[in-house]
């Protein structure tokens, strides 16, 4: 652009209106209310014991830091077999370190 007066054609090179895109969805859905009710009924019929077996209880382990002897609390959720393995490690050579000592190294 050279000159003292600016003209619009220098800025607008080609303006072409875009064709409009149809955003309407023509898909029709089947009524899924019956399916949802069936799923809810199945969950209610499922025995309470089976639901509890899916979720393992959370255990809190309270111990001391092996470096500074401050309290350390560890929350664990696992099946019984893995908890027994953790118990054996904690009774053996595995020691827990508090966050403060862990950052000090």
UniProtKB/Swiss-Prot annotation:
Motif extent (Nuclear export signal): 83-91
Record keywords: Activator, DNA-binding, Early protein, G1/S host cell cycle checkpoint dysregulation by virus, Host cytoplasm, Host nucleus, Host-virus interaction, Inhibition of host innate immune response by virus, Inhibition of host interferon signaling pathway by virus, Interferon antiviral system evasion, Metal-binding, Modulation of host cell cycle by virus, Oncogene, Transcription, Transcription regulation, Viral immunoevasion, Zinc, Zinc-finger
Biased composition (Acidic residues): 32-41
Keyword Lipid biosynthesis listed: no
Processing and modification events after translation: Highly phosphorylated.
Family: Belongs to the papillomaviridae E7 protein family.
Functional description taken from the UniProt entry: Plays a role in viral genome replication by driving entry of quiescent cells into the cell cycle. Stimulation of progression from G1 to S phase allows the virus to efficiently use the cellular DNA replicating machinery to achieve viral genome replication. E7 protein has both transforming and trans-activating activities. Induces the disassembly of the E2F1 transcription factor from RB1, with subsequent transcriptional activation of E2F1-regulated S-phase genes. Interferes with host histone deacetylation mediated by HDAC1 and HDAC2, leading to transcription activation.
Protein name: Protein E7
